[in-house]
Amino acid sequence: MAREYKIEDYRNFGIMAHIDAGKTTTTERILYYTGKSHKIGEVHDGAATMDWMEQEQERGITITSAATTTFWKGRDGKMRRFNIIDTPGHVDFTIEVERSLRVLDGAIALLDANAGVEPQTETVWRQAEKYNVPRMIFCNKMDKTGADFYRSVEMIKTRLGATAVVMQLPIGAETEFKGVIDLIEMNALIWRDESLGAQWDVVEIPDDLKAKADEYREKLIETVVEIDEEAMEDYLNGIMPDNDKIRALVRRGTIDVKFHPMFCGTAFKNKGVQPLLDAVVDYLPSPLDIPAIKGIDFKTEAEIERHADDSEPLSMLAFKIMNDPFVGSLTFARIYSGKLEKGTSVINTVKDKRERVGRMLQMHSNSREDIEEAFAGDIVALAGLKETTTGDTLCDPLKPVILERMEFPEPVIQIAIEPKTKGDQEKMGLALNRLAAEDPSFRVKTDEESGQTIIAGMGELHLDILVDRMRREFKVEATVGAPQVAYRETITRQHEEDYTHKKQSGGTGQFARVKIIFEPNPEGEDFKFESKIVGGAVPKEYIPGVQKGIESVLSSGPLAGFPMLGVKATLIDGAYHDVDSSVLAFEIASRACFREAAKKAGAQLLEPMMKVEVVTPEDYVGDVIGDLNSRRGQIQGQESRGITIVISAHVPLANMFKYVDNLRSMSQGRAQYSMTFDHYSPVPSNVAQEIQAKYSGQK
């Protein structure tokens, strides 16, 4: 089967925005006008095509990005193939946005005309900057009370530090919003309400808006000629670029991420969507317009490039794993080069494992169609892959390459979880592993000390939804607890202890004497053991028993039973008995010796200190620092990054629970933070007493 659409006619793009800016509704309208949906799904009815998980339809938010292929005839009458990814706007799901942006060529950033640039808009914008994704802007909800297009344009400059090139002006606002002025063609488009937005009339620009339209067209031309010397020279000499030239310059500037063309409308009221689709064709890149993807040669580790060309060796990136109720596990992959046929064997170069592509599917939200072959630029769902996880490269076994991996954020919140019944224990393990395979920002581990299963994720809503999915999809009922901090213990001063173990009770007795110096290990947190025995006071074969005895006590410290760190033990003397001594006797002696010594060597409680980085607009710096100080945090420094301030601090993990909620309310949701483990630090004595009182009862 030959390629149906040329690669230059592909547009792989995503729709990104703050929660509630109308992303899913806009995608629904795109699917409706491109003929993929026969009935428009409304989010507030819980019927949107792209929101296909039960929780999404209940909560009215998009959690997983669904990929959809659809088609659109451009202004030139030629059909184009769109691969669209709908992404979530909630901060707990940034991983979904991150992985979508990694495999897309362009994006539409959606703004709510009433709110303008919102906190999550800033977050996803920063993510798109990281991957250098060309973006257009659609100012949605122009029919809403308080809608202000011009304020939104200003906020793009002040909050995002970006340049918006205004391509359309609104005609009316709020309930009076009727249509838009096209600043290239210099005419007005007025939608007919009775046609569900499918028809509009092209009319003259209203008299009261002519001066404004002239002013904004002038601004548009001024901005775009700057990227082309010849056009700039002509412009300075009074020669204006024609409409085709303007479009060509807007396309170039958008693809080079010099500026962002901006449009307006209301997806819900069906106005402005078709010109937006024409703009996707005119201004967003095809796979040929963006730089070739870089990778590393699997064998030589040299850098290589893969171009968007069917004749190149196959390379693709798995960017999402999803459980489908009918097909089982589906791996979404973007094909960067070469072509893929059903039944082909490919190699996963990250895991160094062969995989066979059983079925290949073209996805439309949650319905699907089987395909035999896919080409460079396609986004496909593959069934039957066993080893592949998010971020892995799949490629031609004869020309292996490892494409740049995705970076996944570390989880910032963890809670203990246990099944409600014994029968659910095994099912819970399977469910958690399946969910972790789908979502790299979700981790599962067993706490060795408490035996509890700990789940970690990007926020409370994130974990909430995963526990909910476990109940719905895997029928596992679970109880969720509060997380506990993994404290440690150590000693702070040198102490010498002499201990004799004697047991005489008929038959062979037990005898061992050890003299050991215990002190903090100057080389770090590990345990260090040395023997300085001379003259055979303790025979060589018994010395491993001395070390083993001390090590067995390290797992439970004298204060609250937490593992001990940073201890050094030096065996300096001892005594033995020809008949009654044994390795076991010396193990028992050294164990008791350390237990005695630990109490006298200045035992101290340690707590995990987290490296916390808060990215916040300047207005909230004082509040953020004050709050971190109140959490026993130590501020390490601050620096400006673009139009935000980055604050670094070390904060005890025990004081970071619920921080995400506090930070959101403190900064109206505009600040973000990341947290990683840094080091263990002594617990202040007043806090240590509370912890000891709490845990010594559990020992």
UniProtKB/Swiss-Prot annotation:
Keyword Protein biosynthesis assigned: yes
GO terms of biological process kind: ribosome disassembly
Top-rank taxon, per record: Bacteria
UniProt keyword Protein biosynthesis, yes or no: yes
GO molecular function: GTP binding; GTPase activity; translation elongation factor activity
Main localization category: cytoplasm
Gene Ontology CC terms, in alphabetical order: cytoplasm
Subcellular location field: Cytoplasm
tr-type G domain span: 8-288
UniProt KW keywords: Cytoplasm, Elongation factor, GTP-binding, Nucleotide-binding, Protein biosynthesis
Annotated residues for binding of GTP: 17-24, 86-90, 140-143
PROSITE patterns named in the record: G_TR_1, G_TR_2
Listed InterPro entries: EF-G-like_DII (IPR053905), EFG_II (IPR041095), EFG_III (IPR009022), EFG_III/V (IPR035647), EFG_IV (IPR047872), EFG_V (IPR035649), EFG_V-like (IPR000640), G_TR_CS (IPR031157)
Alphabetical list of NCBIfam families matching this protein: EF-G (TIGR00484), PRK12740.1-5 (NF009381), small_GTP (TIGR00231)
Function: Catalyzes the GTP-dependent ribosomal translocation step during translation elongation. During this step, the ribosome changes from the pre-translocational (PRE) to the post-translocational (POST) state as the newly formed A-site-bound peptidyl-tRNA and P-site-bound deacylated tRNA move to the P and E sites, respectively. Catalyzes the coordinated movement of the two tRNA molecules, the mRNA and conformational changes in the ribosome.
Sequence similarity: Belongs to the TRAFAC class translation factor GTPase superfamily. Classic translation factor GTPase family. EF-G/EF-2 subfamily.
Xref: PANTHER family: RIBOSOME-RELEASING FACTOR 2, MITOCHONDRIAL (PTHR43261:SF1), TRANSLATION ELONGATION FACTOR G-RELATED (PTHR43261)
Name of the protein this chain belongs to: Elongation factor G
Organism (species): Agrobacterium fabrum (strain C58 / ATCC 33970)
